[in-house]
Amino acid sequence: MFAKSTWIKLPRNVLLGHGVLDDVGTAVAELSLAGTPLLVTSPTPDDLAGDRLRAQFDGAETVTVDTASFEAVGEIVEAAEAAGATFLVALGGGKPIDLAKMAADELGVGFVSVPTAASHDGIVSGRSSIPEGDTRHSVAADPPLAVIADTEIMANAPWALTTAGCADIISNYTAVKDWRLARRLKNVEYSEYAAALSEMTAEMLVDNADSIKKGLEESAWVVSKALVSSGVAMSIAGSSRPASGAEHLFSHQLDRIAENPALHGHQVGVGSILTEFLHSGENGQWRAIRDALTAIGAPTTAAELGIDDETVIEALTTAHTIRDRYTILGDGVNEEAAIEVATFTGVI
């Protein structure tokens, strides 16, 4: 008897394009959300677009967050309850969106994602990443009811944020390899459809990296669509597996041990070079990944990340301890092997 079932939660509306920030109110109205929202943002996005957003919601209050933490989630929950908010609208990059996602889940209300930078696929996924001390927690939550991404605003975001978003997507290539490996060796649940969507999205950016240029709104359009596809793949899978493998463990370990960690997307991009070599050896696709990252202006070396070689090696040899997720790292890569991989690929 077949008894398998799945529950796929996806955004109901996705609106991408030039000037669509002014359509947030309309998009929310189409969702039939009653009442008044609480707007969640951080200082820079608020200065950039907060007034345009507030103009679409009479009487909506705003909470501004400075740091990502579980305490900040609690503050948003308290502010929403005090204001009688019936849903949340998050404006900004990863921080406000991740925090609003968790707060909405705790409140049992919906939320709308309004990204101002194409920095990572959390703008559409059902996962939040929240630091606590030297640990970063990946927390499951419902995805946004709607995503409204204004490519004009995103094209004017710091270019490093866009290249980080590109690198985050490109790293899906190795994340899917880890997922398939875990299915074969550990019998983890696997979705061929989610894996194919994630892999196709990564390959699309690798193949078109030369066309992604600073200042081009078309580049923000391409990257935004890729981030949406990656987030949808995670929703279909019901986990972050399609977009998070050993390269993410490597990045999370860098967050813990590096004196000045780089952007998340940049770290997973470099991690993807290393883990692709571990998967496929010197004739694998690590050069294609490296060349794509170079084409968009993302880091490909420890020096370009601003992290010393020793810390990169330590992160690679200890990344498997971050969480109980089987990847190509297995029970750990020894120091000699890590140095060989990082040296051969030019990371150090």
Please provide the spans of the model-predicted regions:
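Short glycine/serine/threonine-rich phosphate/pyrophosphate-binding segments
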Residues: 46-49, 95-101, 120-123, 243, ...
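Solvent-exposed alpha-helices and their adjacent loops that cap or buttress functional pockets
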Residues: 6-8, 31-32, 81-83, 104, ...
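Active-site segments that bind and position negatively charged phosphate/pyrophosphate groups
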Residues: 192-295, 300-303
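A glycine/threonine-rich phosphate-anchoring loop and its flanking beta-alpha core
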Residues: 106-201
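A short, small-residue-rich loop immediately preceding and capping a beta-strand
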Residues: 82-103, 107-118
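C-terminal charged capping/lid subdomain of soluble metabolic enzymes
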Residues: 169, 281-348
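ATP/NTP phosphate-donor binding region
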Residues: 1-87
